[in-house]
């Protein structure tokens, strides 16, 4: 099991966390199976960026109907995985008082889906904060499989008390 590993800040640089496992993600956000769409996070820079990892498996419920002969992960679920990665980053940044709080989508802009994602793929979801003001955060997200971009979007969300 992965452990949360913090790297102390040097000067004014933000705090980094090497990796967190799914149990720590579930402490941060309220999502649960079958709608918890990230398995692990790595390369976390608090207040700035993170990478979420989703191991796509054939047993996921959406593949029963999307599409049985050629399973494709719905694009909206890839965007949701970006949002869950960003929400976890927000909670880790703001601290324990925000654990389990809801983070709601406000906008999704420029969503592009470049290639299908299916069973056996590993999504690496890179999110980077573009800006934040009070409880509203805006992110750019890019999902990749084997280093190739499969989806991207810019989105904003609000953390609710």
UniProtKB/Swiss-Prot annotation:
Any S-S bridges, and between which cysteines?
none
Its GO biological process annotations read:
fatty acid biosynthetic process; lipid A biosynthetic process
Where is it localised?
Cytoplasm
Q: Which CDD domains match?
A: FabZ
Name of one Pfam family that matches:
FabA
Query: What is the protein's known function?
Result: Involved in unsaturated fatty acids biosynthesis. Catalyzes the dehydration of short chain beta-hydroxyacyl-ACPs and long chain saturated and unsaturated beta-hydroxyacyl-ACPs.
User: Which EC number applies?
Assistant: 4.2.1.59
Q: What is the recorded name of this protein?
A: 3-hydroxyacyl-[acyl-carrier-protein] dehydratase FabZ
Keywords assigned: Cytoplasm, Lipid A biosynthesis, Lipid biosynthesis, Lipid metabolism, Lyase
- GO: which molecular function terms? (3R)-hydroxyacyl-[acyl-carrier-protein] dehydratase activity
Q: Give the positions the UniProt entry annotates as the active site.
A: 66
What is this enzyme's catalytic activity, as reactions?
Answer: a (3R)-hydroxyacyl-[ACP] = a (2E)-enoyl-[ACP] + H2O
PANTHER family assigned to the protein according to its UniProt record, in alphabetical order: 3-HYDROXYACYL-[ACYL-CARRIER-PROTEIN] DEHYDRATASE
UniProt record similarity statement: Belongs to the thioester dehydratase family. FabZ subfamily.
Highest taxon of the lineage: Bacteria
Q: Does the keyword Lyase apply?
A: yes
Listed InterPro entries: FabA_FabZ (IPR013114), FabZ (IPR010084), HotDog_dom_sf (IPR029069)
State the signal peptide span.
Answer: none
SUPFAM superfamilies named among the record's database cross-references: Thioesterase/thiol ester dehydrase-isomerase
Give any Gene Ontology cellular component: membrane
Hydrolase in keyword set: no
